[in-house]
């Protein structure tokens, strides 16, 4: 949740206020929607206490945010939504579905693309179909953990340790762990199962970790950014290493052998187009 707030501050600060009127709506961890009157209150985390209730109307004829005022409910018209929500409900097609219901234009991918991209298992199935190389994996369902020995034997049949365990549908490396033996594998499976009913166990690949952003418009053009190399200040790029360890960093356009960078960008474009 705090990551979403940090991202929202960055986005809002880069919007030209001379061109756009910004209506800020925050959602608490409990799911309460609030009208936020300043970026500063997000930055100092006081917005939960200082804000008033707000409701986004799904009425396609209204396209507005309803704000609770002492004198009554104020209707604030909205032309476009810019969701800045990490993880469940924000990146998985849920909030996108609400905007579709209201017929409100919004920034970002649509319902299906968001849902598929958020779910690691489905994304891997797409990558397999495209022939994009990726880490080998074994899918595990939460219900299978009642027969833990059978699950661990299946994993050990495919991989040697260490392996990575991930909830299929979760963000920011939540619930992700690395296992070097069976005991750690069992603990990692139980932890991942707290976040999703689908779990992935992946082989460990020793190498350099890189990332690439992709975006496209309605004209069909798909643009891939330059490649960034992740240098995690930890054993792997977990939640703390991503957001709290200041020694973690990303090198923009690192030196990579041959045409490796372009291969990364092309694979990213292909998957983006497919989903």
Model-derived features: positions:
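Short, intrinsically disordered, charge-balanced linker/junction segments flanking boundaries
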Residues: 1, 268-275
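ATP-binding N-terminal substructure of ATP-dependent carboxylate-amine bond-forming enzymes
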Residues: 1-107, 111-112, 116-118, 122, ...
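Active-site nucleotide/adenylate-binding loops and adjacent lid/helix of ATP-dependent enzymes
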Residues: 2-9, 75, 114-208, 218-219
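Short, well-ordered secondary-structure micro-motifs
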Residues: 35-37, 147, 175-176, 213-214, ...
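Glycine-rich phosphate/pyrophosphate-binding beta-alpha loops
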Residues: 87, 173, 230-234
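Short hydrophobic/aromatic-enriched beta-strand-loop microsegments
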Residues: 105-109, 134, 224
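Phosphate-binding site of ATP-dependent enzymes
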Residues: 180-266, 271
């Amino acid at each position: 949740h705090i990551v979403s707030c940090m991202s929202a501050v960055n986005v809002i600060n880069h919007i030209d206020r001379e061109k756009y009127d910004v209506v800020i709506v925050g959602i608490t961890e409990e799911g309460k929607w609030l009208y936020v009157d300043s970026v500063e209150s997000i930055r100092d985390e006081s917005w939960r206490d200082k804000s008033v209730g707000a409701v986004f109307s799904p009425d396609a004829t209204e396209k507005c945010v309803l704000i609770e005022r002492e004198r009554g409910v104020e209707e604030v018209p909205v032309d476009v939504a810019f969701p800045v929500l990490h993880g469940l409900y924000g990146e998985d097609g849920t909030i996108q579905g609400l905007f579709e219901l209201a017929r409100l234009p919004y920034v970002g991918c649509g319902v299906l693309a968001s849902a598929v991209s958020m779910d690691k298992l489905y994304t891997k199935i797409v990558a397999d179909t495209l022939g994009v190389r990726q880490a080998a994996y074994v899918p595990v369902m939460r219900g299978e953990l009642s027969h833990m020995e059978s699950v661990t034997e299946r994993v050990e049949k495919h991989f040697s340790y260490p392996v990575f365990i991930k909830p299929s549908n979760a963000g920011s490396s939540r619930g992700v762990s690395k296992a070097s033996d069976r005991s750690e594998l069992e603990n990692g499976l139980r932890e991942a199962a707290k976040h999703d009913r689908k779990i992935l166990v992946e082989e460990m690949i020793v190498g350099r970790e890189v990332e690439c952003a992709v975006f496209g418009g309605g004209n069909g053009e798909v643009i891939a950014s330059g490649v960034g190399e992740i240098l995690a200040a930890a054993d792997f790029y977990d939640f703390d290493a991503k957001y709290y360890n200041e020694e973690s960093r990303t090198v923009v356009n690192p030196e990579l052998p041959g045409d490796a960078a372009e291969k990364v960008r092309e694979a990213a474009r292909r998957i983006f187009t497919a989903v």
